[in-house]
Swiss-Prot record:
Positions of the UniProt region annotated as Leucine-zipper: 149-193
Coiled-coil portions: none
Protein name per Swiss-Prot or TrEMBL: Homeobox-leucine zipper protein HOX15
Source organism: Oryza sativa subsp. indica
UniProt keyword Repeat, yes or no: no
Entry's Gene Ontology molecular function annotations: DNA-binding transcription factor activity, RNA polymerase II-specific; sequence-specific DNA binding
Keywords assigned by UniProt, alphabetized: DNA-binding, Homeobox, Nucleus, Transcription, Transcription regulation
Compositional bias (Low complexity): 32-44
Pfam families in UniProt: HALZ, Homeodomain
Region: Disordered, residue numbers: 1-44, 223-248
Summary of the tissues where the protein is detected: Expressed in seedlings, stems, leaf blades and panicles.
Amino acid sequence: MAQDDEDVGLALGLSLGSGGHRRQRESRDEAPSSAAASLLTLRLPAESGGQPQVVVKREVVRAEEEEYEYEYERALYSSSAAAADDDEGCNSRKKLRLSKEQSALLEDRFKEHSTLNPKQKVALAKQLNLRPRQVEVWFQNRRARTKLKQTEVDCELLKRCCETLTEENRRLHRELQQLRALTHSTAAGFFMATTLPVPAATLSICPSCERLATAAAAAGASPTAAADRTNKPTAPHLFSPFAKSAAC
């Protein structure tokens, strides 16, 4: 009796398992790929002790499709933007061809005003049949050329000033060396003149010293001696031109 019950339960379990598996496969085949549906996967692991464990796995198909469409649109937009940038870059790199009248008018306006406000820019662009951006770029380039020319002129002027100052510095250095040599030779000659003995031929008589010596001798001597000294010529007093007397 117990054996019969076990056989019946086993048959029911097998029939239920096979029926669930078949229904799951049919629903999976019938579900469209573009529909947002949840797929249920049933499995009976051996370690669960005979208890069926249901693992639910959600896959949102629409979300995946939307993400794919977003990536595709993004790539398409990036390629179109890159192409537009390339076209704009090519157009911006093209040199602007101006007629003589346009160039003359731009030069006159630049002499009046080196910079333009938006209103002046638009008015000048309409007058020249150009775009405001082209007028702005022309003024920017013209200011850059003017600044470059002024910088070159200033550089040339500074170079000339530097050369002049260098030559003046050399001349002053030569003069300083000459003055130092002259001062050294003069000091050496003066030292030799004061230390060497003076020859007798270079000595001369000091008149004031001679008068003082005569008066002192007359005051201390007798009248006879004074008369004799007066009648007798006195010896000349010699002095050096480098050593002056205090009475002179």
